[in-house]
Amino acid sequence: IGAVSPPGGDISEPVSQATLRIVKVFWGLDANLAYKRHFPAINWLTSYSLYTDRLADWFSKNAAPDFMELRGKLMTLLQEESELQEIVNLVGMDALSAPDRLKLETSRSIREDYLHQNAFDPTDTYTSLGKQVLMMRAILAYYDKAKEALANGADIEMLCLRSSYIF
């Protein structure tokens, strides 16, 4: 484990780069996530592991055969959300197509329901691999079914209703 906190967060300086070459994993802490009370405040777009390919077999055997595929789909949605969020910030949500709005809604679920933790809650402190797989499948099942419903003429507003609006 190597921990580096360079001045100004500039990880391009030599000590940080040497550490990254040795540990081959980077968890990018994000002040914006912390300000939004999203913990752990690890940025999923800047963080990486060079061990992912080596661990694929382990996850296939110990979590689910399709674990890496599920992970890849979630990461793709989060990356697309980042691109779409730039458009929303410039011209507003109304400029997005229904499928793009669905991507944003699904990504919100990934962030808030899957990646967000409350370390003080006994249930939320730790999640087993089995539960993680079920959560990933549930989020992606929602996305696939909602995409199908959109193709059949469903209203995006109804597909994106949060439970707080229903009760």
Where are these regions (language model features)?
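P-loop NTPase catalytic core
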Residues: I1-Y165
